[in-house]
C-alpha cells in the first residue's frame, strides 16, 4: 500500500508558521517511507529548502480568497489529481480547502484537513466559510483545545462518516537541542543584538501583533523593575511587524514611557531561533488570545529553558505547570511580573531541573517524528 500512497498537500504559502512547517515535515517524511509527495502552494521562504528530488512542487495562487480563483484552482487540482493519480488531498487552510473539497468530490479521492487555528467568525457567512475544514473524511486538530473548539462550534458539520482526531503538532528536537550550539555563534548573536552578557536575558518571540501580548510584556517588565528597584535583565522582543508600523511605534513609545529604552531590544528577525533561545535565560509567551498550539512554549522546553506562558489555548497542554514551566493569568501584567520575579530568583539547580523536565516532555509528546508517523498512519488507515 505505502508505495502506492501519493499525497498532495495544499497550503497558501510555505512560510515559517506552524501549518507551513508541518506541511514541510510531512512532505519529506513520506518519501522516506516509500510514498510520493506533492505540494501545491503560491510560494514562500521554505520553498528553497524543499528537496525537489523527493517532493514535487506546483505553484498556484491558492492563497487567494477570490471565489473565481478558488474555482479555477479546483479544476487545476482535478488535473493534477488525475495525471499523478493522487491518493488523497490534505488541505491546511480554508481558501484552498474549498478548491480541494470540490476537486476530491469530482475525482472521488479522500480529503483530509488540519484545523490549525480557531478561525474567528463574527457572522454565519464567515462560519460557513470556516466550515470547509470540517467537511473532510479526516479532520485533524492540532491540540485538544482545537478539538473542543471544533466540537463546540462546528458540530452540525460532523457525522459518523467523518473522523475527528487530535494529532499534536511536533517540532524538530534535533534542531531545538541546547547541546548543538557553539559559543562563538552565541557571542556573535549577542553582539548583533547589542547586548553584553552581564545580565540575564528574557526573550519574547512572536510577530508584532496586539494579541501576541507585547504590551502586557512591557508593562510586566516595568512592574518587575519597580519591585526590584533596578534593571536586573535585558528584554528582547523578537519578531517582525509585518507592516504594522503603527503598532511597533506604539510599543516603542510604551517602552520609552516606562524608561525601558536601554533595557528592551526590538529585533526584527533571527534566522536561527534555537540560538536565540540558547542565549536567553527565560522565555515568555504572552498571547492574550488562545493559540491552537503555541510553538514558542514547545521550542523553549526543547531547549531546556524555563517558559512562562499565558494560561489559555495550547500552552495548557504543552506546559506541565510548575514542572516544565509556569502559567500566568492571560492579559494580566501583574501576574506575569510575579512569575518573572519568581523565575529570576530561582537557583541554578532548580532551573536545570525545569529545563531537563521540559526537554523530556517535548521529546516524548511533541516530537516531529511522532507527528509525522501518526499522520502517515492515519493516511493509510483512511485509504484502507
Q: Which positions does each model-derived feature cover?
A:
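A conserved mid-protein helix/loop that constitutes part of the nucleotide-sugar donor-binding site
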Residues: 20-25, 200-226, 249, 334
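Short His-centered aromatic/hydrophobic patch
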Residues: 91-97, 115
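Active-site donor-binding acidic/aromatic loop of nucleotide-activated sugar
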Residues: 243-248, 260-270, 276, 326-327
